[in-house]
UniProtKB/Swiss-Prot annotation, chains A, B:
Entry cofactors: pyridoxal 5'-phosphate
Modified-residue entries (N6-(pyridoxal phosphate)lysine), positions: 208
Gene: hisC
The UniProt record lists the keyword Amino-acid biosynthesis: yes
Stated name of the protein: Histidinol-phosphate aminotransferase
Organism: Lactococcus lactis subsp. cremoris (strain SK11)
Amino acid sequence: MSWQNNLHSVSPYIAGEQPELTDMIKLNTNENPYQPSLQVQKVIEDFKSENLRLYPSTDAKFLRKALAEYHHLNTDQVFIGNGSDEVLSLSFLTFFNGQRAILMPDISYSFYPIYCELYRIPYQKIPLADDFSLSVNSYFQENGGIVIANPNAPTGMAISLQEIEEILQNNQDSIVLIDEAYIDFGGESCLPLLEKFDNLVVVQTFSKSRSLAGIRLGIAFGSAEAIAHLYDVKNSFNSYPIDSLAQKIGEASFTDETYFQKSVSKIITTRENFKNELIKLGFQVTDSKTNFVFVHHPKIDATTLFKVLYEAKIIVRHWNQARISDWLRITIGTDREMNTVIQFLKEYLKNKEKSY
Amino acid sequence: MSWQNNLHSVSPYIAGEQPELTDMIKLNTNENPYQPSLQVQKVIEDFKSENLRLYPSTDAKFLRKALAEYHHLNTDQVFIGNGSDEVLSLSFLTFFNGQRAILMPDISYSFYPIYCELYRIPYQKIPLADDFSLSVNSYFQENGGIVIANPNAPTGMAISLQEIEEILQNNQDSIVLIDEAYIDFGGESCLPLLEKFDNLVVVQTFSKSRSLAGIRLGIAFGSAEAIAHLYDVKNSFNSYPIDSLAQKIGEASFTDETYFQKSVSKIITTRENFKNELIKLGFQVTDSKTNFVFVHHPKIDATTLFKVLYEAKIIVRHWNQARISDWLRITIGTDREMNTVIQFLKEYLKNKEKSY
């Protein structure tokens, strides 16, 4: 007997590297290349540190209200967490407490099975088709819950509002969690379905389209009943997860719709241009509705490509994992950054062909 | 069958009220009456919001390093969490995973049993003596872990380093978690015992003595092995719990030792003066080593006293709970605030005596 016998053993999630090179092109964690709204800068400048002696609002009251108004929902339908990873984590803990396995695509955000192992939630992976498309029919079976990223990561591919509605219609006895971390880059949000389904929970984040990965804010939207349960679990986990400054920064980021739309549009335009250039170079590229592309080249091994890009100080993401080990995920940066990537790949492919 | 059947049912912790009255004297959540170090203000002023587009360090690397240096420990002995509530929560999940009940005092931080219920950890409450003192012998029995707040809350009373060492000596096969949230106000930290015991975990916070309740930073110190396990669980729960600004603010608060010592001393002096005045008024007051006092008046019902204080806009804390329902916990504010409380109580007692 030793204290080590009482440990909860887990295999943790490994986040994308945050390297300390200064002259790199960092395209590995889907960060936004543009700064957050200038309203955020203003809030920070105006913040008085003496306020920090007091505890923040336990449930980020004003931020929830701002988000509810923005999305035409009630405040009690909005949950704020410490990044969407925490929102997902607490959602798994709250909603997936049944005996039956929860369902998720076999290729998706790799944190989902890790939450399941942390909380000992049985789960079943449903294979995507060979082209990474999702068939809703495979979710018409008994389950203890469903989690689907829409658009999906790392494929970038989206399913339609109608498909989500079909899943909901066939699964009214378990929570259907739709992770919309990347929804603002071209997918269709299922928030309107909250009117019809009290078992739908939609998770979004400030980290991607709002350029606020550094401040850790995530959201869950759902029925007042579901959100109340999520708050009960949150209040059994941590009283005050969102600091005062983060609450104010979150509010500020929703006051400048013009800037938001402009920076999102820019990323979408860059993505489409980048994608076309990649196709010209012989890459296979999925139909991404996100701020990244998922790519494969029939003539280059992805592990090798990851390495040569890294040596050229271009950092992308690669998984040594069945079905996707031949693929790379590349975040959309600025036009300039993506041009550098294209120029590098052109050169690399030219030299490679010469060497045949 | 319905989605509600899959819910994880809990009775959440209820934090002290954060009322929105502006002219109140808020002595209910043990906040520091003094502002944080001016270095904190400077860090906020200098912060560039464009940095927020990037994810923060997953493990608050520089802040851990600063804390390790301050306490003469190694960086791998330091864990940073989103407030000490999160640190405690993740510690319970990580370390208390055995079959045997964990032990805790019957009167202590009311979050402990709530974590146990959240994670389904069996626990046993060990009664304090009638004078709220803790007998170490009652912790010499089989257990799956031990958690003790030192100084204790809400009693404010501390145990000695030697007593903690005795507990550790008799419990080398389970984690002994010492919650030192209030340690800087007069208790003796058990950090030096980390040299001898790899099963000791010490939790501290930035919320009390560092005046940073609003920024949500908590710490666990332990053996490199214990801390690595805690990080594994944290990395299965949430990748990036501490935002970039909070990491910098935490670092800044440790650069101004003079200010820190001065504000802590001031609170201790105010506490002792306040305590003496209360005793003169007939109150029974425990020997507090914290920034609050725990008080009882033989002639006044605590529920009534709580109410009349509230009506006078003086907000303190009361629990409707066995053994302490006759007691109030009063945070130490400024001298001026505590004088107002004393004046009010003098007046109230005088009028009460008249009415006999």
